[in-house]
């Protein structure tokens, strides 16, 4: 999914364009965990060395390397907002089946169908389907940590389902955060720095609630402002 969602670093594309075979930087790179606001704003930590959310869905020319240019950050694209997808439904059914709910079907089949549907859904936004062929989908679903194994423990199965559901929810960060809070999966790296004084990275603390509306804070102040909820 990475080429669909994220842009290659500008340094990587520049090296390709210039025929630089000595480039050793990352093709896709995220911002390093632990940077403060000042460090994030430094030129050496900018988009030249880090990916932005402009993959094949938003700016196909950049990741397909057909006409890479320096105006990558000025692109404007309108994509539909996903409320609930078939892939998410399948993965919810996989979890329900694993927990013994009636009528949820087979856990493993729901899991595999959810991944397949999620990948197809992401490609549906492409202007040219050939930019992201499904050639390697089966390998992705049947190897490594993604592969379904009936002999795994219940917790291992829950982790696989939760991780794939988290991926399927992108870019709905709020729901993905809520699912991670609910299930405990995927296992995310602890925050190493926080600009919020209420979050202590030393204790592996993370965001526990989102900001409530003013009406909620006024009418339900005790619960809306409680640090324990």
Task: List each model region and its residues.
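Acidic/polar-rich alpha-helix caps and helix-coil junctions
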Residues: 3-229
């Amino acid at each position: 999914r990475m080429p669909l969602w994220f842009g290659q670093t500008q340094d990587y594309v520049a090296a390709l364009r210039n025929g630089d075979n000595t480039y050793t930087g990352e093709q896709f790179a995220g911002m390093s965990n632990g940077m403060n606001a000042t460090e994030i704003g430094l030129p050496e930590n900018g988009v030249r060395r880090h990916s932005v959310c402009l993959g094949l869905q938003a700016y196909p020319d950049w990741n397909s390397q057909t006409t890479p240019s320096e105006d990558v950050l000025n692109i404007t694209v309108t994509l539909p907002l996903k409320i609930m997808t078939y892939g998410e439904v399948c993965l919810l059914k996989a979890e329900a089946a694993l927990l013994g709910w009636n009528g949820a079907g087979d856990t493993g089949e729901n899991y595999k169908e959810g991944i397949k549907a999620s990948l197809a859904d992401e490609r549906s936004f492409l202007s040219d389907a050939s930019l992201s062929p499904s050639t390697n989908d089966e390998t992705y679903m049947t190897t490594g940590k993604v592969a379904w194994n009936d002999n795994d423990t219940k917790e291992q199965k829950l982790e696989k389902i939760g991780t794939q559901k988290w991926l399927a929810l992108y870019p709905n960060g709020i729901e993905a955060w809520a699912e991670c809070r609910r299930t405990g999966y995927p296992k995310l790296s602890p925050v190493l720095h926080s600009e919020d004084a209420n979050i202590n990275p030393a204790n592996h603390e993370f965001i526990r609630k989102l900001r409530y509306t003013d009406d909620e804070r006024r009418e339900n102040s005790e619960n809306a402002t409680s640090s324990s909820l």
